[in-house]
């Protein structure tokens, strides 16, 4: 509920973060809807204390799918960016699970037209084709298309530090002005008795 969100905002602000995700790729304020709240009002109230503290807010965007798990018409996605900007969202973090730049390109345009910062993601995985050169070239292509920031999106938490370091170094060598963020979804589980015993 929005009253709960507003209560935890000061604690998040006190952490000293510079940005906070306010709309994830799977929810779109579904919890607010379940409680009978207007999600547009909820997002505005949720982002207000962060903006007052100088903290930017993010939204997650699945490229051609928007916030859904299936494609969204272009005119709807274009309007969506304008609505999110009006709600107080500063940055859009766009990703395509296929790492297809063609799917991300329209989001860059829509974000910039709406006055938002376009942050584009490299979805990290391991295969013979997903090399340091592959990700470097993808980042450079996204920047050429107008991306303001690059996100190293390590959703499975499998990124190898040496490889990630090389990717970042390559991007910075070509574009030192481009901010690069690392985003990981790490799930920790308690060790099993077998792990503890070492057997």
Where are these regions (language model features)?
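Active-site beta->alpha loop and helix N-cap motifs at the rims of alpha/beta catalytic domains
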Residues: 25-106, 117, 122-136
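Catalytic core of soluble alpha/beta enzymes
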Residues: 137-175, 179, 187-190
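Short, well-ordered coil/turn segments that N-cap beta-strands
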Residues: 17-19, 51-57, 89-90, 114-116, ...
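Single conserved hydrophobic/aromatic residue that forms the stacking wall/gate
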Residues: 188-199
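Non-catalytic positions within long, well-ordered alpha-helices that form the structural scaffold/packing
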Residues: 13-14, 85, 143
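Catalytic domains of carbohydrate-active enzymes, especially glycoside hydrolases
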Residues: 7-24
């Amino acid at each position: 509920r929005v009253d709960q969100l507003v209560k935890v905002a000061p604690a998040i602000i006190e952490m000293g973060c510079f940005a906070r995700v306010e709309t994830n790729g799977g929810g779109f304020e579904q919890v607010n809807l379940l409680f009978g709240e207007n999600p547009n009002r909820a997002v505005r109230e949720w982002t207000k204390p962060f903006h007052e503290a100088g903290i930017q807010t993010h939204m997650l965007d699945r490229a051609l799918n928007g916030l859904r798990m299936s494609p969204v018409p272009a005119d709807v996605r274009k309007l969506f960016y304008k609505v999110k900007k009006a709600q107080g969202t500063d940055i859009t973090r766009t990703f395509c699970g296929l790492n297809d730049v063609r799917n991300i390109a329209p989001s860059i345009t829509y974000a910039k037209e709406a006055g938002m910062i376009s942050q584009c993601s490299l979805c990290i995985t391991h295969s013979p084709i997903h090399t340091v050169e592959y990700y470097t070239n993808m980042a450079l292509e996204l920047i050429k298309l107008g991306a303001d920031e690059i996100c190293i999106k390590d959703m499975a938490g499998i990124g190898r530090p040496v490889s990630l370091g090389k990717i970042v170094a390559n991007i910075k060598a070509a574009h030192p002005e481009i901010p690069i963020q690392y985003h990981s979804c790490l799930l920790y589980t308690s060790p099993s008795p077998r792990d503890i015993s070492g057997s």
